């Protein structure tokens, strides 16, 4: 006997997970008012004004909520000491203000020219009643994407591409929530000696000693470890990528054109300071190959894409003197922020390679694409600066 909630298949009863679907539907219903931002984010101002002070529970993490407010920046300026008053969010971004924010937080905060995000309230916790809770603001773009802005650190993080994704994930793509609000374990899979070597390299990077990092990578080139990657929730991990120590000269021989592309991103006088290539991240992925057309004599599989041969995705790990780790793809020239430090990379894994934590300007790039650090402060294409900004 089968009912609406059960189905019989191969002699077994498969129970539908209506509970999870119902929970997601309820979470999406709580944030349906965010759909007013489609095409005109200013419509949210009237809604947040009428419902000012209301708290909406976030799907993740637990005990976190969104407190609606029509103008959260005004109250934050009056209640706290905010050093980035002229840095963000303006209607038009000037290179000088972007560089100032980058020098202080080691991260570019950039918004497209003429593009303005609409703030809807503060992101805070039920358990902690601290003035620092008012320094996180939730914003919505014209395309419906949801962002969180950390005013103290001058960070802008893309949380979701639409309301449905935000109702399912919450703050899962916020690196600050992963690094500070969760006690994640070390996700390295390697021996004791290799783990100690990577700990020594991480300690040298924390002390901004790039010469020591380069010397250790050159001496122990080829040593590798497996990094686990989180899926679905912060505590479920699967094998992600293999991190192998290397030197820049060896990679430049394999990718002759990548050196010039990298120097276009990290030029002399960059706010992140000098940098060095220390390791390579390699990940295997399947390619989708279309089936042969009907009548071609090949095997007919419904003319749908089938899994093809596996190829290796390669990315360089770049250590900067300012602290953060960057990831650079030598085949296409993309670059993004990988982690704040090696310790954060050990805990969070290489999720940034999939575009989860790329910091993008709204309306310019598709969600998941790696975005350059900042387009407004790039040097003009032509002769590269003579000043040396990297360590080979």
Curated annotation (Swiss-Prot):
Task: Write down the superkingdom of origin.
Answer: Viruses
Q: Name one GO cellular component term.
A: host cell nucleus
- For this UniProt record, give its keywords in alphabetical order, as a comma-separated list: Host nucleus
Presence of the UniProt keyword Transcription regulation in the record: no
Establish whether keyword Amino-acid biosynthesis is in the entry.
no
InterPro entries xrefs = US22-like (IPR003360)
Q: Which residues form a coiled coil?
A: none
User: Where the protein is mainly located, per its record?
Assistant: host cell
Q: Where in the cell is it found?
A: Host nucleus
What this chain does, per the entry, is described as: Inhibits the host G2/M cell-cycle progression in a p53-independent manner.
- Family, similarity comment: Belongs to the Roseolovirus DR6 family.
What's the entry's take on its domains?
A: The N-terminus is involved in nuclear targeting.
Protein name, please? G2/M cell-cycle inhibitor DR6
């Amino acid at each position: 006997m089968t009912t609406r909630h059960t189905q019989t298949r191969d002699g077994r009863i498969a129970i539908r997970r209506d509970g999870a679907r119902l929970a997601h539907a309820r979470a999406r219903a709580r944030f349906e008012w965010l759909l007013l931002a489609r095409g005109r984010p200013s419509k949210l101002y009237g809604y947040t004004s009428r419902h000012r002070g209301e708290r909406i529970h976030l799907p993740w993490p637990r005990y976190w909520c969104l407190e609606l407010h029509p103008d959260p920046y005004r109250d934050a300026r009056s209640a706290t000491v905010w050093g980035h008053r002229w840095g963000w969010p303006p209607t038009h971004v000037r290179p000088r203000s972007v560089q100032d924010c980058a020098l202080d937080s080691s991260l570019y905060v950039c918004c497209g020219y003429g593009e303005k995000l609409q703030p809807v309230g503060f992101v805070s916790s039920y358990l902690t009643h601290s003035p620092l809770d008012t320094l996180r603001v939730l914003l919505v773009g014209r395309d419906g994407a949801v962002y969180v802005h950390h005013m103290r650190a001058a960070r802008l993080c893309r949380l979701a591409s639409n309301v449905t994704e935000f109702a399912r994930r919450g703050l899962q793509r916020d690196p600050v929530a992963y690094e500070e609000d969760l006690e994640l374990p070390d996700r390295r899979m390697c021996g004791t000696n290799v783990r100690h070597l990577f700990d020594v390299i991480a300690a040298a990077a924390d002390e901004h000693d790039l010469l020591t990092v380069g010397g250790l990578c050159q001496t122990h080139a080829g040593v590798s470890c497996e990094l686990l990657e989180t899926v679905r929730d912060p505590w479920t991990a699967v094998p992600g990528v293999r991190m192998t120590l290397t030197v820049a000269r060896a990679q430049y021989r394999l990718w002759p054109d990548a050196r010039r592309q990298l120097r276009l991103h990290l030029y002399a006088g960059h706010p992140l300071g000098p940098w060095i290539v220390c390791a390579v991240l390699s990940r295997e992925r399947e390619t989708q190959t279309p089936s042969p057309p009907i009548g071609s004599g090949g095997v007919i599989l419904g003319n749908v894409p089938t899994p093809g041969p596996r190829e290796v995705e390669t990315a360089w790990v770049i250590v900067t003197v300012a602290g953060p780790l960057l990831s650079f793809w030598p085949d296409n020239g993309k670059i993004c922020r990988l982690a704040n430090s090696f310790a954060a990379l050990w805990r969070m894994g290489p999720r940034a390679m999939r575009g989860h934590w790329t910091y993008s300007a709204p309306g310019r790039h598709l969600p998941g694409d790696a975005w350059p650090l900042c387009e407004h402060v790039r040097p003009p294409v032509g002769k590269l600066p003579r000043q040396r900004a990297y360590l080979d």
